UniProtKB/Swiss-Prot annotation:
It holds the Pfam family WH_Rok. InterPro entries: WH_Rok. Residues 75-116 are annotated as: Disordered. Disruption phenotype: Increased expression of comK, increases transformation about 5-fold, decreases sporulation efficiency about 5-fold. Increased excision of mobile element ICEBs1. This is Repressor Rok. Residues 2-43 form a coiled coil. Keywords: Coiled coil, Cytoplasm, DNA-binding, Repressor, Transcription, Transcription regulation. Repressor of comK, the master regulator of competence development. Overexpression seems to be lethal. Represses at least 20 genes that specify membrane-localized and secreted proteins, including some that encode products with antibiotic activity. Binds to many AT-rich sites in the chromosome, many of which are known or thought to derive from horizontal gene transfer; helps keep mobile element ICEBs1 quiescent in the genome. Binds to its own promoter and is thus probably autoregulatory. Residues 75-96 have a biased composition (Low complexity). One of its GO terms (molecular function) is DNA binding. The keyword Amino-acid biosynthesis does not apply. One of its GO terms (cellular component) is nucleoid. Residues 95-191 are annotated as: DNA-binding.
Amino acid sequence: MFNEREALRLRLEQLNEAEVKVIREYQIERDKIYAKLRELDRNGSPSEIKKDFRSEKKPDSLPVLAELAAQEIRSYQPQSQQQSVQPQLQSISSLPAGIPDGTTRRRRGTARPGSKAAKLREAAIKTLKRHNAAIKSSELQKEIEKESGLEIPNMTTFMQSLIKMYPEVKKPYRGQYILEGEIESAESANE
């Protein structure tokens, strides 16, 4: 029976999925901006770089949001408290900022390559690639377990995490999954 509690739980899940999607979009845009800034740093003349970028933000300065938060704190505190906060802000500003050159972000909560979850995910992607149409969850679970030799304790949770990691995996109907689009390989995506 579909009651109010179930409806609220379903809405929370939908909100979580929408939030993850928006966060992913922001991360992609932020990565593009950082890449463009690094490219401009490499291609621009040293005098232009100093004028445009370095004078505004030092390499070891706080990220923009942290700087704004520190300014907010300063504006709300009386003068006597500002003196005690100043040493704390200096220690915070010594932390590295932004994404270091040549590195990619790794999503939190992802399993290490070679782990049980990674093997199951790889088997799931291979199985979904073999099927052109939607496949029942129970059939998919049997094929994944047969291919990987590992047991999936909770198929719903496993597939939800797979969908978050690979947006190409879709759930067209209740209890059915399909792979729409291309995924190079599960191994290269985990690196």
